[in-house]
Every structure is written in structure tokens, then in C-alpha cells.
């Protein structure tokens, strides 16, 4: 099916349905695989889990745990027992939390809608292209399951051409309950960690 013109009403409706999974049904827990590419060459990969509630998240990979409570971010590096504390910019949030698209798509992007098959499932492929060429991410491609509107894959191109991130969602569970403390670093759990405050 050929791509439809820019602000496709169907694409917006599909995006609204997918976004509602993250905003109206409690928290979300996902397992994922993230790959970073430069000029088509794989630069690095990571697998992990992510817990999301509104604009808060906790992400765990083999090397790092990140907590974000909507304002402050803590990144714990397992290898050197170190915690970086920061207040991320919106652009930094987008690179850490793929679900920022929940608000991102609503303004500043054109849409294109196609249909495809991914992992044996029928999907919508929606390409978001920034109207402002200086905006980052410049291009976002979302693969959305046609049956339940779950997000299956996100590809993001940063403003610098040739740099892509692909996040494949392996499992997605909606309607999860999380405590506020799930999104904050607890120093009692890491008594030996060196805390580096970058705020």
C-alpha cells in the first residue's frame, strides 16, 4: 500500500490509540533490544526492561540502571559503582525514553502511513518527519501492531544524518502499578556508590 499524504488522518488516529495505552491504563512494562547505527554500521546493542508511568521511567540494562521521576534523573553504572545525577533536557529524555513519542508526535511532524509485516504480525508503519530540519529526532518510524495498537519497534534518526537508534519491543504489558519510589534512586540500596551531581 503506497504511503499516504503528509498529515494522514488515519495515521493520527492510530498514534492516538497507541499513545492512550501509555496514558490511560496505568503503567507500562516493556522488554526491549536497542541498537545504535552510524552510516548503517552497528555501533552497539543493549537489552533491558523499562517501567513507565506518565513521564516517569526506570530502565534496566546489563550495564546500567536509570531512574527518572519527571524532573531528576539518576544513572547508576554497575561497572564502577557510580551514580550520575542530572536534569535531562527534552532531547536527552527522547534518547533515553522512547515513549516520549506519546507527546512528541502531536506537533511539529508530518506523518506517512504504510502497512507491513513484522515478526509475522500485520503492522502499521508510521513515519514522522520533523517540519523543522533542525529538530531532533528528525525522523521517527513507528511499527504498530494492527490488532492491539501495541508498539513493536521504534527507529529514530537524530539531526546528524547517518545516526539511527532502533528499539525493538519484545514484550509489552499495560495496566501495571508502580510506586513513586520505583522511579527514584535509593542510596540505601547502593551504600558504596559514588554520587556525582551534575545538576
What are the language-model segments listed below?
Residues 25-27, 45-47, 54, 68, ...:
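Extracytoplasmic
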Residues 47-96, 161-166:
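An acidic-aromatic
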Amino acid at each position: 500500500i503506497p504511503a499516504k499524504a503528509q498529515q494522514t488522518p488515519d495515521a493520527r488516529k492510530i498514534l492516538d490509540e497507541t499513545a492512550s495505552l501509555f496514558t490511560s491504563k496505568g503503567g507500562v512494562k516493556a522488554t526491549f533490544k536497542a541498537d545504535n547505527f552510524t552510516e548503517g554500521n552497528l555501533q552497539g546493542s543493549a537489552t533491558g526492561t523499562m517501567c513507565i508511568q506518565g513521564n516517569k521511567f526506570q530502565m534496566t540494562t546489563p550495564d546500567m540502571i536509570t531512574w527518572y521521576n519527571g524532573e531528576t534523573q539518576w544513572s547508576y553504572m554497575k561497572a564502577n559503582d557510580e551514580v550520575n545525577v542530572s536534569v535531562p533536557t527534552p532531547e536527552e529524555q527522547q534518547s533515553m525514553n522512547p515513549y516520549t513519542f506519546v507527546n512528541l508526535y502531536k506537533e511539529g511532524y508530518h506523518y506517512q502511513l504504510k502497512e507491513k509485516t513484522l515478526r509475522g504480525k500485520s503492522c502499521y508503519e508510521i513515519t514522522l518527519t520533523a517540519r523543522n530540519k533542525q529538530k531532533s529526532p528528525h525522523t521517527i518510524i513507528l511499527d504498530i501492531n494492527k490488532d492491539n495498537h501495541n508498539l513493536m519497534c521504534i527507529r529514530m534518526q537524530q539531526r546528524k544524518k547517518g545516526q539511527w537508534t532502533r528499539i525493538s519491543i519484545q514484550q509489552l504489558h499495560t495496566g501495571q502499578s508502580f510506586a513513586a519510589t520505583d522511579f527514584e534512586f535509593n542510596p540505601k540500596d547502593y551504600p558504596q556508590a559514588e554520587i556525582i551531581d551534575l545538576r
